[in-house]
Amino acid sequence: MRVTQGCFSFLPDLSDDQIKQQVSYAMSKGWAVSVEWTDDPHPRNSYWELWGLPLFDVKDPAAVMYELAECRKVNPEGYIKINAFDASIGTESCVMSFIVQRPITEPGFYLERNEIHGRNIQYTISSYAVQARPSGDRY
């Protein structure tokens, strides 16, 4: 099951040249770029691990591509995404985010159903990867 989070998630994976073009676009807008990774792809897991520091004031996409390459070396089977943050007054938010690497196999999610008080049914989704292995050993 292909995880679909962020921009371009329904398109084929971006090449490094396409990633660099998106980073250049973000930098041309004055947005700060950061690299994040995770091994827990749950849709509500919006706080991924930050790789290094956000690249504030960096104007060269090559620096971001270097950090991405280093993150890929350390996390060869994890999810990696690039975020762009607009710090301008009135926005102050993540304005672009897209996955740049994913595991070769993505096991997907399962639906858990629990009966709670008053015969109410509570549903939640969980990742097969998270259930099967501890953090850091999932892919």
From Swiss-Prot:
GO biological-process terms attached to the record: reductive pentose-phosphate cycle
Protein localization: Plastid, Chloroplast
Any matching Pfam family: RuBisCO_small
An example molecular function term from Gene Ontology annotations: ribulose-bisphosphate carboxylase activity
GO CC, any one term: chloroplast
UniProt keyword Cytoplasm, yes or no: no
Disulphides: none
Signal peptide positions on this chain: none
InterPro entries cross-referenced by the UniProt entry: RuBisCO_ssu, RuBisCO_ssu_dom, RuBisCO_ssu_sf
Primary location: plastid
Keywords (A to Z) from UniProt: Calvin cycle, Carbon dioxide fixation, Chloroplast, Photorespiration, Photosynthesis, Plastid
UniProt family annotation: Belongs to the RuBisCO small chain family.
Subunit structure as annotated in this protein's UniProt entry: Heterohexadecamer of 8 large and 8 small subunits.
Further remark: The basic functional RuBisCO is composed of a large chain homodimer in a 'head-to-tail' conformation. In form I RuBisCO this homodimer is arranged in a barrel-like tetramer with the small subunits forming a tetrameric 'cap' on each end of the 'barrel'.
Stated role: RuBisCO catalyzes two reactions: the carboxylation of D-ribulose 1,5-bisphosphate, the primary event in carbon dioxide fixation, as well as the oxidative fragmentation of the pentose substrate in the photorespiration process. Both reactions occur simultaneously and in competition at the same active site. Although the small subunit is not catalytic it is essential for maximal activity.
Protein name according to UniProt: Ribulose bisphosphate carboxylase small subunit
Gene: rbcS
